[in-house]
Amino acid sequence: MNVKETKLEDVLKSRGIDMKDAYNISEADIPEAKESTQKLMDIYYTLKVTADMEAAYWYNRTWWENDGEVIEVRRAKAVAASLSHMTPTILPYEKLVMNKTKNVRGAFPFPWVCASFFNAQAEALMNEVDAPAENEADSVSVVGAGGGNVTESYGNVISIAKKFGMRKEEIPVLVKTSKPWEGISVEELSNKYSKMTPGYDQFKNIMESVICMFDSFAIPQGREVINYYMPLQYGFDGIIKLCDEKIAEVMGEAGDDGDFGMSRGYYYAAMKEITKGLSAWCENYSKRAKYLASIETDSEIKANYEKIEEVMGNIAHKKPANFWEAIQMTLCCHFGVVNEDPQSGLSIGRLGQVLQPFYEKDVEDGIMTDEEVIELLELYRIKITCIECFASAGVSGGVLSGNTFNNLSLGGQNYDGLSAVTPLEYLIVEAGMRNQTPQPTLSVLYDEKTPEDFLMKAASCTKLGLGYPAWMNNQTGMNFMMRNYGPEGMDLHDARAWCLGGCLESAPGCFLPLEYNGKVTMIPGGASPTCGTGVHFIGMPKVLELVLTNGLDKRTGKQVYPPHNKKLDSYETMVNQWKEYMELTTDVVNRCNNIQMDIWRKYNMPAVNSLLKPDCFKKGKHIGTMGARYNSCINFESCGTITFVNSLSSIKKNVFDDSKFTIEEMTDAMLNNFGFKTAYETEVFSPDFRESTDKSTKYEKIFAACVNAPKYGNADKYADEIFKAYHYYIYDMTHKFRSYYGKPLYLCQISVSTHGPQGFVTLATADGRLAGTTYSDGSVSAAAGTDKNGIYAIFESATVYDHSMHQNAQMNLKLHPTAVKGINGTRKLLDLVRAYMRKGGFHVQFNVVDSKTLRDAQLTPEKYRELMVRVAGFTQYWCEIGKPIQDEVIYRTEYDK
């Protein structure tokens, strides 16, 4: 063995790795998921996404029975009733229980949030036809046709939003439940008052052109991190006792707050009601398990039911006494919050750090083994994967792609600034490798203090092609926290508690003292409302298109923006006009969104979430009245960043710098799709397919010049300077506008799946992209097929600005499986991540998959029911993703070394 090998062997041994493994083509086999997991996953794969009216009925009934009650208490009673009356469903082999509804993949409508669609379509629904699209964004959004989606009606099932199936006998209940909300739902009240804003007509034009993807009221909660501290520390009976004490202390007392002081008593009364509802919900599961055990003849399943009876009976009243009870308690609270509102992105946070004290004691006492803990973690993944969001097709398909972004973060720093990695987090990764489900997605908060063996474990998981874990720069996240929340008192301790809310939204947190097993452990959790309910997904290439067409949308023939009537005789004139349209867009959309969210918080204030989030209970204020510790959390979401930047680069180079063409010639070529058929005609939504028309020769020179213009992602200063200038402009621009909390907006850069529908409504762009094809994905990913100088050149381009300026930055990369084979491949993958993090990059995620496999799966989806891919901050089953996004994922540049 030579000296070089000896040194490598020493290094590997110090990391607990055998030298022989470095040369193996494959690493150790991953154990199969537990039998209980496999049986329940077999059931999951057969299920359809089902909407029913049980929860909505009880909410509606209780709401109207309490007409005249104080609004906070009325709301809490209604939510509590919807939980406590839900039919408890327990499947054989389950060890963790509870779901959103009585159905495993269940969801339900929220007519008190949005009733107009159901009321307007009552006749169509009663006549047993597919519910039509609600708006323009719905009509151009595509939901995956496979898996559990119900894309069309059949038999006794009606399709709603091209995703949810509802039994025909439920439709009359839906119609009757929706009727009382006519004119007074959050949606309709918002519309009423939004019409009073001076820019309302402009707002409608923007929404109808799909420049903005959807309204805030559609998913008013989520994109935040839940906090499990209260029930883990006190238990439900303990919380009820605390509520009684607080009611006695503050009822009738305003303190020194003349605005909200008197409302503290009503807040605690509401918290008592919702806690009673959560307790009753758990009690119902305990009773159901007891009954099932009494009739079960299989001894193993009977023992499961008896254990469920014990666990659910205990957590219905007492704080958790062991790991099993603690993880079940977190599920109860999680389902409680996601049932309050239509929402996505209620993230789990740093669960492995929250539950570490319970795990540690059980292992030390011999109560559970690591394998038994892994089984519960595998089953936990199924529970989270079953969470569905009842929303329109535009939200379900065009934004979420069927995922609900329940992100679980790993690593980072603890309260004292040391590595926060716990032994339980190794098992969480292991469970994600064994039971490969879309949720919860995993995110590593990469820190220089993170143990090397944990990073290697996480990289081994990423290699499997599951799309998780993704990798975040912990230091950049902390810097953003201090920058954005410093004015609200954020200190270094709280900055260390941050993690991801939703797919990629940096969310503030705090540490709280959990007393358990004779110790006090500072556990992290969320400390803010939603971090993603602002200006939702502005298609920046579309705005640029309308600059070139004088505000006229040539696709629809509508005058979207006021004509600027300017001669675009310089690059600066064009960009300044884009800025004017962008600021007009932000102004009118933000005003209307503020009204929507203000109406929501006045009538639909969170109940469960306002119990859990610090410092609501301490202040006696719900989330809507800024009870949470941090409230500067409302964002401006962008889409198509790199398509936009590359378009600017092309126009600047070809029109203004080199004078190859006039701006009129460039615009004409774009309006004529460079002489090619559009994606509307070909039904191919990625740039790798072009079908010529008889006009193609007319535009071939200009098309070639557009394709060959400098592109972002190649460490090319020409394009990168445009990219950098954009970021400093958008930072200043977003901070000019205020949220309904009176705090500045900030930039959120996640495409999610909106680059599909927003690309669909956008004509050809100056970078050579054709009409109707998807925008570039992410925000710092190179546009597919344009990165010519390798991954490290993309890293150079991506880090020309400070990533802590914004809430996030999204980097998607696709690797061929052969590029990361064996232990050496794992090391290469980790080195790639580390290189980007050290340059200041915020986020990177990987698809490790062969494009040939994806193409075959697109043609024969029935053969690939379990295939998952990374889309944009989340993983989803391939067959449940719409074709435009499938095409985009296939066409992403694939690196094989």
From Swiss-Prot:
<feature type="active site" description="Proton donor">
    <location>
        <position position="505"/>
    </location>
</feature>
<comment type="subunit">
    <text>Heterooctamer consisting of 4 large (HpdB) subunits and 4 small (HpdC) subunits, arranged as a tetramer of heterodimers. Also forms a catalytically inactive homodimer.</text>
</comment>
<dbReference type="Pfam" id="PF01228">
    <property type="entry name" value="Gly_radical"/>
</dbReference>
<keyword id="KW-0456">Lyase</keyword>
<dbReference type="InterPro" id="IPR051215">
    <property type="entry name" value="GRE"/>
</dbReference>
<feature type="binding site">
    <location>
        <position position="503"/>
    </location>
    <ligand>
        <name>4-hydroxyphenylacetate</name>
    </ligand>
</feature>
<dbReference type="GO" id="GO:0043722">
    <property type="term" value="F:4-hydroxyphenylacetate decarboxylase activity"/>
</dbReference>
<dbReference type="InterPro" id="IPR001150">
    <property type="entry name" value="Gly_radical"/>
</dbReference>
<feature type="domain" description="PFL">
    <location>
        <begin position="35"/>
        <end position="770"/>
    </location>
</feature>
<keyword id="KW-0597">Phosphoprotein</keyword>
<dbReference type="GO" id="GO:0005829">
    <property type="term" value="C:cytosol"/>
</dbReference>
<protein>
    <recommendedName>
        <fullName>4-hydroxyphenylacetate decarboxylase glycyl radical subunit</fullName>
        <ecNumber>4.1.1.83</ecNumber>
    </recommendedName>
</protein>
<comment type="function">
    <text>Glycyl radical subunit of the HPA decarboxylase that decarboxylates phenylacetates with a hydroxyl group in the p-position. Active toward 4-hydroxyphenylacetate and 3,4-dihydroxyphenylacetate, forming 4-methylphenol and 4-methylcatechol, respectively. Is likely involved in the catabolism of aromatic amino acids such as tyrosine fermentation. 4-methylphenol (p-cresol) formation provides metabolic toxicity, which allows an active suppression of other microbes and may provide growth advantages for the producers in highly competitive environments.</text>
</comment>
<feature type="binding site">
    <location>
        <position position="637"/>
    </location>
    <ligand>
        <name>4-hydroxyphenylacetate</name>
    </ligand>
</feature>
<feature type="active site" description="Cysteine radical intermediate">
    <location>
        <position position="503"/>
    </location>
</feature>
<dbReference type="Pfam" id="PF02901">
    <property type="entry name" value="PFL-like"/>
</dbReference>
<feature type="modified residue" description="Glycine radical">
    <location>
        <position position="873"/>
    </location>
</feature>
<feature type="binding site">
    <location>
        <position position="536"/>
    </location>
    <ligand>
        <name>4-hydroxyphenylacetate</name>
    </ligand>
</feature>
<keyword id="KW-0556">Organic radical</keyword>
<comment type="similarity">
    <text>Belongs to the glycyl radical enzyme (GRE) family. HPAD subfamily.</text>
</comment>
<feature type="domain" description="Glycine radical">
    <location>
        <begin position="778"/>
        <end position="897"/>
    </location>
</feature>
<dbReference type="InterPro" id="IPR004184">
    <property type="entry name" value="PFL_dom"/>
</dbReference>
<feature type="binding site">
    <location>
        <position position="344"/>
    </location>
    <ligand>
        <name>4-hydroxyphenylacetate</name>
    </ligand>
</feature>
